[in-house]
Amino acid sequence: MQTKQIFRWFLNTFVKIFGVMPFETLKPQVKSIVLNTKKTVDERLLAICELLETHIDYYNWVGFYFRNGSKEELKLGPYVGAPTDHTIIPFGKGICGQVAVSNQNFVVPDVTAQDNYIACSINVKAEIVIPIFVNGENIGQIDIDSNTPNPFTEADERFLEFVCKEVATLF
């Protein structure tokens, strides 16, 4: 067996056993999507959402929010998952709105324990939001909802920070 075939076999076996693709194997795919200039920025963002939602079993809703011009609000960008009514989120409201103000990652292991949480679905149990910075300015964020209680680890945070740094190069 050639090295490439062995790697493919190992990766497929890992995914079958654990139900998720390791973050390190997703990084080159994220980079490849970002570098694909044949697609629009929104198409690339959607492809990243699809990649994450497909390969990480506890990522049940994956989307991007971006600052809406000069307004103190976020506007929903590309996403995959259940439709949401939250297409505009004022700064400070909900987890996403808080990240727009704090410029910090926000990991919520149990959304029912959060006072300032905007419910998108009764199925959502946890959320993670990571800001996207361009030249030191918070321009948006990636938002992940999970139907699994407390699924996010430090590895998720580091991986999503990587994704956000790659996405930042599109702007």
Q: Where are each of the predicted segments found?
A:
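Juxtadomain coupling helices with adjacent low-complexity linkers
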Residues: 23, 31-34, 146-171
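Intrinsically disordered, low-complexity terminal regulatory regions
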Residues: 10, 14-79, 83
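Regulatory sensory and allosteric helical modules in signal-transduction proteins
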Residues: 66-119
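Short loop/turn motifs at secondary-structure junctions and domain boundaries
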Residues: 56, 119-124
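Sensory-domain boundary capping and coupling elements
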Residues: 133-146
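Low-complexity, intrinsically disordered or signal/transmembrane-proximal segments
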Residues: 2-5
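Short hydrophobic/aromatic beta-strand element in the GNAT-like acyltransferase core
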Residues: 61, 129, 141
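A short, aliphatic-rich beta-strand micro-motif
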Residues: 126-133
